[in-house]
């Protein structure tokens, strides 16, 4: 097969193993990555590349309804974690 015939597929992110979350239920893992992402961008800025790892992780682990609700809570000022 030549390089011209090769078809590439889009990259699908899969979260790796995190020793802090050894169980099958990944709810806490989802939550922690969401919080870590927002703490990271507040501390380092949106353009800081390592923050993207947290973004990819929470987007792959969390149902979209969860992080949309958390975004609404952050905007309303009643998010349960202090991110600063």
From Swiss-Prot:
InterPro entries associated with the record: COX6B-like (IPR048280), CX6/COA6-like_sf (IPR036549), Cyt_c_oxidase_su6B (IPR003213)
Record-given protein name: Cytochrome c oxidase subunit 12, mitochondrial
Family matches, as Gene3D superfamilies: Cytochrome c oxidase, subunit VIb
Residue interval(s) of motif Cx10C motif: 51-62
Domain-related comment: The Cx9C/Cx10C motifs are involved in the recognition by the mitochondrial MIA40-ERV1 disulfide relay system and the subsequent transfer of disulfide bonds by dithiol/disulfide exchange reactions to the newly imported protein.
Disulfide bridges in this chain: 30-62, 40-51
Similarity remark: Belongs to the cytochrome c oxidase subunit 6B family.
Pathway field: Energy metabolism; oxidative phosphorylation
GO BP of this protein: oxidative phosphorylation; proton transmembrane transport
Record's function text: Component of the cytochrome c oxidase, the last enzyme in the mitochondrial electron transport chain which drives oxidative phosphorylation. The respiratory chain contains 3 multisubunit complexes succinate dehydrogenase (complex II, CII), ubiquinol-cytochrome c oxidoreductase (cytochrome b-c1 complex, complex III, CIII) and cytochrome c oxidase (complex IV, CIV), that cooperate to transfer electrons derived from NADH and succinate to molecular oxygen, creating an electrochemical gradient over the inner membrane that drives transmembrane transport and the ATP synthase.
Membrane topology: Peripheral membrane protein
Top-level taxon: Eukaryota
Keyword terms: Disulfide bond, Membrane, Mitochondrion, Mitochondrion inner membrane
Binding partners and assembly: Component of the cytochrome c oxidase (complex IV, CIV), a multisubunit enzyme composed of 11 subunits. The complex is composed of a catalytic core of 3 subunits Cox1, Cox2 and Cox3, encoded in the mitochondrial DNA, and 8 supernumerary subunits Cox4, Cox5a/Cox5, Cox6, Cox7, Cox8, Cox7a/Cox9, Cox6b/Cox12 and Cox6a/Cox13, which are encoded in the nuclear genome.
Pfam families attached to this UniProt entry: COX6B
Record-level GO cellular component terms: mitochondrial inner membrane; mitochondrion; respiratory chain complex IV
Segments carrying motif Cx9C motif: 30-40
Domain annotation CHCH: ranges: 27-70
Locations listed in the record: Mitochondrion inner membrane
């Amino acid at each position: 097969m030549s390089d011209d015939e090769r078809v590439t597929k889009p990259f699908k992110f899969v979260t790796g193993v995190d020793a802090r979350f050894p169980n099958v239920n990944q709810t806490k893992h989802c939550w922690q990555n969401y919080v870590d992402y927002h703490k990271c961008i507040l501390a380092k800025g949106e353009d800081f590349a390592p923050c993207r790892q947290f973004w990819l992780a929470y987007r792959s682990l969390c149902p979209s309804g969860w992080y949309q609700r958390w975004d609404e809570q952050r905007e309303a000022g009643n998010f349960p974690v202090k991110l600063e």
